Amino acid sequence: MTSAPPRWTTAELAEDAATSAAQFRTERLAVTDSWGTHYNQARGKFELLFKKLSDLNPEAITDDNLAEAYGLGLGEALRYLAGPPISDDDLQVIADVESIAPGVLKKNAEALRKVFGVIERVIDPHRFPWMETGGMPTEQQREAALLASSVLLAAQRIATERRNEGKDNQETMVKDYLRTLGFTEAPAAAINTIVKGPQAMQFCAECQLGERKADVVVRLHDTRLMAIECKVSNSSTNSVKRLNNDAAVKAEYWIKQFGTAQVVPSRSLVSSRY
């Protein structure tokens, strides 16, 4: 006889949320060298970029040293010269080039100039005031620009790292729990019909379920598929947004695509704060 799934009371959810919040505070306040590592890596990138582009002296920036900078993997640092920084996708669309891959830009001077032309138009005047007037920066301007740019890139890097770590940790906890129930992991595969994907007592991670990706897909004992979303947020407002705008939207799509009797959308609250 199948038992009914548990239904948590508001008080129980509030207690779990408080426990998770306490764990979150402990993790964030723990001593770590992550920030220093990201800052030093970013600083190294910008110092090398300044060296290759003659301290961003507009008159000294040539196709050759731009190509060399991209070849050295400094494309990200170049994007962060913009105020605000510009994404890979946006830069490619605005520059109207087929690719901004370093290997491509190194061999295509026209595309390279179009890409840097976009960056020049949106260069941050607060960090790089000398680029508007031409010439070299003062030592104070140079140091301020290096510091601000390194902090900007490092902050983005560590924010991305924290999001990925939280999601990965949550997925790991879900998969470990499934293993304790006797499930085994199967290779990820595109699931376009209800019979595809993991089979009896199996699950897969990062599977394409229809046209939407699911974090974990489980083949239940009754042959239905359970799609589990593992999303991490550290504020109640963002958690509600993620539930409504991400997990709920996917759930609606999967039910419409596969039917209410065939798929069980769910949301993991294992390690999120709320």
Swiss-Prot record:
Output one GO BP term. DNA restriction-modification system
GO function term, MF aspect, one: type II site-specific deoxyribonuclease activity
Q: Which InterPro entries match?
A: Restrct_endonuc_II_XamI
Q: What is its EC number?
A: 3.1.21.4
**From the record, what ranges are coiled-coil?**
none
Q: Name one Pfam family in it.
A: RE_XamI
Top EC class for this record: hydrolase
What is the name listed in the Swiss-Prot or TrEMBL entry for this protein? Type II restriction enzyme XamI
Gene source species = Xanthomonas campestris pv. amaranthicola
- Taxonomic lineage per UniProt? Bacteria, Pseudomonadati, Pseudomonadota, Gammaproteobacteria, Lysobacterales
